[in-house]
């Protein structure tokens, strides 16, 4: 997170951002990229890949994708793969009609919450 924040704030990887990324990659036994990446966009792509691999079972991916603006596209790509029958999901049974819209970036406001707070007159967009 520090590497991502440094990169976003400064528009390019800083020595601190590179050191944070190096620490993660060293722990995993992966080669160091320090000094090889000068573009903020390229550095962010590497951070996205690192977070996907490092935190794959931590239930953070959804929030990362929403923060980066990639959620709807990435989830719809996965739905197509799930329906293709050429992967571990065993074909169309895994996601027969599933398509993600921008509404899925938010959770709906529960009816119980709306019932006790009359100032909540609607719901999140798409719900």
Predicted regions and their residues:
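Acidic/polar-rich alpha-helix caps and helix-coil junctions
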Residues: 1-127
């Amino acid at each position: 997170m520090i590497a991502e924040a440094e990169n976003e704030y400064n528009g390019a990887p800083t020595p601190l951002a590179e050191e944070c990324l190096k620490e993660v990659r060293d722990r995993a036994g992966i080669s160091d990229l320090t000094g090889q990446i000068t573009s903020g966009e390229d550095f962010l792509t590497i951070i996205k890949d690192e977070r996907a691999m490092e935190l794959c079972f931590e239930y953070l991916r959804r929030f990362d994708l929403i923060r980066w603006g990639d959620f709807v596209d990435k989830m719809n790509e996965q739905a197509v793969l799930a329906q293709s029958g050429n992967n571990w999901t065993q074909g169309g049974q895994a996601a027969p009609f599933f398509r993600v819209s921008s509404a899925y970036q938010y959770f709906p406001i529960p009816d119980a919450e709306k019932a006790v707070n009359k100032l909540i007159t609607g719901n999140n967009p798409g719900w």
